[in-house]
Amino acid sequence: ARETAWAARGLGARLNGETIRVSEATDLARAAVSTGNIGSLARSNRWASLGRIMARANRTRGYGDYYHYHRLAAGQIDAVIESDVNILDIAALVVIVREAGGVFTDLDGNDPGLDTTSVLAAAPGLHGELLDRMRA
């Protein structure tokens, strides 16, 4: 897809020049969830938690790379879960998603930092539930 997303703290987010916002989703049973790199998650005790999330979600996708974060920021999907990232993969995406109104943390609910290796990014109305489900 040919698209350009950008954001600046306090100035919002844009995709191809248009202002974007995350969805207002609050119900996982009606939500679309995308996963990216999940190799280490598959080898952890959280694999079952992810399975329960995916079984409950309305739709699941596996876009990967930047693309599912753009879809999240534009309100076209509702959450992204990944377990194998580094700060270079996500630094710009954190700003884009947050400026579009989303919540962007690691799988433990911490703000991204230099040592971040996982992501839970979602519409505000879903993030807390997804975080709780990943911890279960």
Placement of each model-derived feature along the sequence:
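DPxDG-like acidic metal-binding loop motif
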Residues: 1-14
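An extended, acidic
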Residues: 21-136
